[in-house]
């Protein structure tokens, strides 16, 4: 297990649940000074990050890259994997694939959180979960070329109405077939809202949990 801390590069998310906001160089320097093993980076998009510069900063500060978030896909670009518009869903998938291609060569995974979207309007719950499952399966397979899993994060009820608990996440992943290359992110903020017992929820997540947010 390695400890990590977050660096957000997304101005539209300023004030959100991230620690460092003043660029990669500042974030990596401060993460190393605090003794963390790794950083999580949340960029506006893959093109906003110079992979060579990021690798050099990680090497300079003896850090690893734990994950790269895709949240700006929704926050900045209004893309989800469950949109009623098939072209929007494809654009969402393409955005995530670019993040995977940024993170994967550095040994890191992409995180799917807010880009999972919600059901409503012309898309009922079953259809939305079908879209989400298809996307996770395809993107997990895409990530396999980099020998990293895709990370999927259940969110609280105020951010999605699809998967809000560890049990929901397990059910979704179990429906993806054998060895889908997708793991769960157990985020204690969301879990504190949705779970009746954190310990039981973590046990329910079990082998599916591959990443934790405190």
Enumerate the predicted regions with their spans.
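N-terminal pre-domain/capping segments
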Residues: 1-104, 137, 179, 207
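Active-site-proximal loop/turn and secondary-structure-junction residues that shape catalytic pockets
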Residues: 9-11, 43-45, 71-72, 116-118, ...
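A short, acidic/glycine-rich surface segment
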Residues: 14-16, 193-196
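Active-site acidic/histidine proton-transfer and metal-coordination neighborhood
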Residues: 22, 60, 79-183, 193-195
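Short, compositionally biased strand/turn segments
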Residues: 28, 184-186
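Conserved beta-strand positions in the central sheet of alpha/beta enzyme cores
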Residues: 40, 67-69, 111-112, 151, ...
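Alpha-helical transmembrane segments and their juxtamembrane interfaces
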Residues: 50, 163, 197-200
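A short alpha/beta connector and helix-capping loop motif
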Residues: 55, 195-214
């Amino acid at each position: 297990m390695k400890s990590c801390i977050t660096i957000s590069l997304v101005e539209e998310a300023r004030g959100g649940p991230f620690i460092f906001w003043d660029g990669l160089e500042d974030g990596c320097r401060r993460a190393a000074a605090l003794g963390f093993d790794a950083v999580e980076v949340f960029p506006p998009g893959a093109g906003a990050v110079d992979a060579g510069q990021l690798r050099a900063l990680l090497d300079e500060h003896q850090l690893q890259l734990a994950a790269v978030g895709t949240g700006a896909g929704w926050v900045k670009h209004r893309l989800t994997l469950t949109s009623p518009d098939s072209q929007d869903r494809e654009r969402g998938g393409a955005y995530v694939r670019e993040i995977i291609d940024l993170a994967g060569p550095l040994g890191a995974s992409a995180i799917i959180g807010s880009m999972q979207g919600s059901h409503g309007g012309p898309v009922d719950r079953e259809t939305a979960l079908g879209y989400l499952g298809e996307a996770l399966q395809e993107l997990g397979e895409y990530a396999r070329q980099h020998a990293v899993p895709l990370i999927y994060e259940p969110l609280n009820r105020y951010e999605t109405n699809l998967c809000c608990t560890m049990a929901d996440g397990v059910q979704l992943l179990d429906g993806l077939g054998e060895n889908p290359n997708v793991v769960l992110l157990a985020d204690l903020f969301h879990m504190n809202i949705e779970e009746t017992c954190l310990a039981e929820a973590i046990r329910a997540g079990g082998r599916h949990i591959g990443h934790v947010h405190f």
